[in-house]
Amino acid sequence: MAPAWSFLLALLLLSCNAICSLGCHLPHTHSLPNRRVLTLLRQLRRVSPSSCLQDRNDFAFPQEALGGSQLQKAQAISVLHEVTQHTFQLFSTEGSATTWDESLLDKLHAALDQQLTDLQACLRQEEGLRGAPLLKEGSSLAVRKYFHRLTLYLQEKRHSPCAWEVVRAEVMRAFSSSTNLQEKFRRKD
């Protein structure tokens, strides 16, 4: 009987250790892949931004959703997930497939998919700790509206190379802001 209890206790301790080691450390798990996405987005550039100056547009980037002073780490994870998910969807459209280098686009999809997987694990963990959804509806809505404006702009411009260049630069801006947000939490930790 004693060996059975010893075995169960050892198994319980090992399970606890494995579960506890799955902690979500946003700045550490997300920053490097985020930089990878930025690098890939930079490499996608096909058109000189200066040749697309007439196509520039103010998409009203929701800076407050990514940089508000009241944003907590758990909410930041939700915002980052939302930005990553919409970026994945945007660069998975038929129009993007005809615009960008297929190999780079595949790498971008893989990097974004990995980020989504990591962020979803963090979301589940944080929601489990708090017992409630993390994202304030206002932040989620602001991010969704921002990406909707990008999509409408692409449709309006008929997915022209310059329109995609403008959108690529905008998405890089969103990812740069999320990197800054991560750095803010890294300094706090």
UniProtKB/Swiss-Prot annotation:
Q: Which PROSITE patterns match?
A: INTERFERON_A_B_D
Q: Which UniProt keywords apply?
A: Antiviral defense, Cytokine, Disulfide bond, Secreted, Signal
The encoding gene is: IFNAB
- Highest rank taxon of the organism: Eukaryota
This molecule's function is given as: Produced by macrophages, IFN-alpha have antiviral activities. Interferon stimulates the production of two enzymes: a protein kinase and an oligoadenylate synthetase.
Q: What is this protein called?
A: Interferon alpha-B
Q: Name one GO cellular component term.
A: extracellular space
Name the protein family.
Answer: Belongs to the alpha/beta interferon family.
Q: Between which residues do disulfide bridges form? A: C24-C122, C52-C162
Signal peptide positions are 1-23
Xref: PANTHER family: INTERFERON ALPHA-5, TYPE I INTERFERON
Kindly list the biological process annotations in GO that this record carries: adaptive immune response; B cell activation involved in immune response; defense response to virus; humoral immune response; natural killer cell activation involved in immune response; positive regulation of biosynthetic process; response to exogenous dsRNA; T cell activation involved in immune response
Q: Where does it primarily localize?
A: secreted
